[in-house]
């Protein structure tokens, strides 16, 4: 959806149509909110079942695994809802802001990895919680920057079905391509876990970095 959102915002900017720009941004937020809802429903049903019933996780690490899983769902939702703001910044060609925020995000992630050495709590849980908090902070920064610099970046309660259908259709092919890549990468990780246990997942995770 990122490329579709960016494309439609850029087109509206080129036309100089502020009303269309507001429609595109608000429609994009609605689409991403719907995607987030689907992620939550699937994650808290099929995902939890798969975690408890199929994945090979030592009993003493199950609590940590559940924490990581729930934080991952929350982080995914935050990332999904950040897409319209990211696309808006790129469409307006504010690359310096995008670069500075990205540098801040990477620096914070490096900081929490370094802080794990000093953490008195479970390091896996600590990393998952702080990763989610960083995603939330970056999302707030993007939203604040966009609302301050781009008037269209404030949500308006509009429902424009033709635009919704057009954006969804445009994003369809890239969606299936990205979904295939995710299923290949994460599906392989899950298969390795199911047949060989977590001992094989660790080197696999390092290998694909």
Where in this protein do the model-derived segments appear?
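Small-residue-rich midsections of specific transmembrane alpha-helices
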Residues: 1-13, 28-39, 74-82, 138, ...
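Transmembrane-helix boundary and interhelical linker motifs in polytopic inner-membrane proteins
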Residues: 1-34, 51-57, 85, 90-97
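Alpha-helical transmembrane segments of multi-pass membrane transport and lipid-handling proteins
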Residues: 29-56, 111, 115
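Short alpha-helical transmembrane interface motifs in multi-pass membrane proteins
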Residues: 31, 66-71, 94-98, 169-176
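Alpha-helical transmembrane segments of multi-pass membrane proteins
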Residues: 45-48, 57-82, 99, 103, ...
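Hydrophobic alpha-helical transmembrane segments
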Residues: 70, 99-149, 166-170, 201-209
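Interhelical loop/hinge segments that connect adjacent transmembrane helices in multipass membrane
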Residues: 124-130, 142-190, 194, 199-200
């Amino acid at each position: 959806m990122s490329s579709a959102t960016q494309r439609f915002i850029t087109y509206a900017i080129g036309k100089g149509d502020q009303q269309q720009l507001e429609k595109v941004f608000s429609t994009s937020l609605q689409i991403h909110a719907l995607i987030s809802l689907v992620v939550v429903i699937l994650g808290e049903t099929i995902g939890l079942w798969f975690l408890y019933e199929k994945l090979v996780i030592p009993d003493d690490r199950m609590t940590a695994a559940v924490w990581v899983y729930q934080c991952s769902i929350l982080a995914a939702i935050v990332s999904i809802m950040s897409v319209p703001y990211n696309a808006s910044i790129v469409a307006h060609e504010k690359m310096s802001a995008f670069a500075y925020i990205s540098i801040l995000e990477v620096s914070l992630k490096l900081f929490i990895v370094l802080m794990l050495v000093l953490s008195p709590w479970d390091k896996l849980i600590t990393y998952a919680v702080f990763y989610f908090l960083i995603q939330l902070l970056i999302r707030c920064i993007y939203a604040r920057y966009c609302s301050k610099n781009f008037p269209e970046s404030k949500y308006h309660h509009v429902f424009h079905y033709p635009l919704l259908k057009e954006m969804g259709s445009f994003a369809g092919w890239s969606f299936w391509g990205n979904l295939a890549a995710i299923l290949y990468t994460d599906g392989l990780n899950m298969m390795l876990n199911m047949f060989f246990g977590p001992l094989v997942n660790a080197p696999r995770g390092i290998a694909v970095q």
